[in-house]
A protein has these predicted regions:
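An acidic/histidine-cluster motif and surrounding catalytic segment
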Residues: 1-114, 119-131
């Protein structure tokens, strides 16, 4: 079972079902089944995203999505309770809105795409990977 922890400010009307669907679609696409896993998804504003990028990426830009994996030096960390804690996906709501408008898609479609992208990073996929 995959436990999806969602954190969002009430100012950001993100559809939680879409966030959950995005996570589950990536797991299905990657044929990840019969696993106890946990992932968190947070929806934040520009100020919080800028603080995160300043601290962790040292660029201070507003990214649409960031991923913060929880892994040991040799890959995913084994926990005493056998729950695979993958990490956190963080979406910047104002950037989601801008991307949706730019790409002429709905906010839900953009949330689905960006959340899925973030989850793929947590699973070890990176830009340019073909597998």
């Amino acid at each position: 079972m995959v436990k999806i922890l969602i954190s969002t400010d009430p100012r950001y009307p993100v559809n939680r079902k879409v966030l959950r669907r995005a996570v589950m679609e990536v797991f299905e696409k990657e044929k990840i089944t019969d696993i106890d896993a946990e992932i968190s998804v947070a929806v934040v504003g520009r100020r919080k995203m800028k603080a995160l990028t300043s601290k962790y990426l040292k660029d201070g830009r507003n990214h649409e999505v960031l991923s913060f994996p929880v892994e040991g030096t040799g890959g995913f960390a084994r926990t005493p309770d056998d729950i695979l804690r993958l990490g956190d996906v963080v979406l910047c709501w104002p950037e989601v809105l801008l991307c949706a408008a730019r790409d002429n898609v709905t906010c839900d479609e953009e949330v689905l795409k960006l959340t899925g992208h973030g989850v793929e990073h947590l699973l070890g996929k990176h830009h340019g990977d073909t597998n």
